[in-house]
Amino acid sequence: MRDKIVAFQFMFLLVCIGSPSLYAQTDSLPAISTSASVDLMSRYIWRGQEYGQASSIQPAMSATWKDFTIGAWGAYKLTGAGVQETDLYLSKTIGHLTFAIWDYWNFCDTTSTDFFNYNQKTTAHLLEAQVLISGGENLPFNLLGSYLFYGADPSKSIYLELQYQYSAGSTELQFFSGFQAKGEYYGQNSTFVNLGCTMIKTIDVTDRWCLPVSLSFTVNPSQKSTYLVAGITL
């Protein structure tokens, strides 16, 4: 297991630092497209749970070739020491289906850490198998399925989330309902853990630059908690 995971990470690094000539369009090899973004969030909320108890900067980068995407995502507190996060993923899209493997890694920046520790009993990594079913343009529903199959969750939790998307001019709305079907990672039993709505509005700053601003209201019935989070994407 460790060798396979290290090989995956090595492949990710090759994509990220490869020669720029790899990104050129040729007759025999489709172009590799890349993307990068930085989100500034008032809080880091993921699937109904709060992480860090502070504002968060969340960088992301990815490279896509044909229907394969490999990328990295992180969440780091803007104030104070504590738990930080660096994630890697590999996904494949087939029609309305997207399959992905995620490697979530949480670490404390005040203690020694070992990114390459994948021992089942001591690792801070969490490996997830994920599938997303998209309804497409004619059916604005998505269904997300997640299975935490290795690492820091010994209960091997299963999480399901139904999403509904709606657009009105420059404003996008997404309603979501997340349910823990198995395990104890998100709550103590099978229950709804992530209910709410996200609104994203694009604000024109100049003729050539716009700024996406998001507001999310989240309710976690299992923890009896609510969050109202603001964010911008750079």
PLM feature segments, named:
Residues 25-78:
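Short glycine/proline- and aromatic-enriched beta-strand/turn motifs that initiate or cap beta-hairpins
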Residues 30-34, 53-57, 64, 82-86, ...:
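Residues that define the transmembrane beta-barrel architecture of outer-membrane proteins
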Residues 38-44, 67-78, 99-107, 114, ...:
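Transmembrane beta-strand segments that form the barrel wall of outer-membrane beta-barrel proteins
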Residues 109-122, 187:
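Flexible, solvent-exposed loop segments that connect beta-strands
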Residues 117-182:
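Detector for outer-membrane/organellar transmembrane beta-barrel domains
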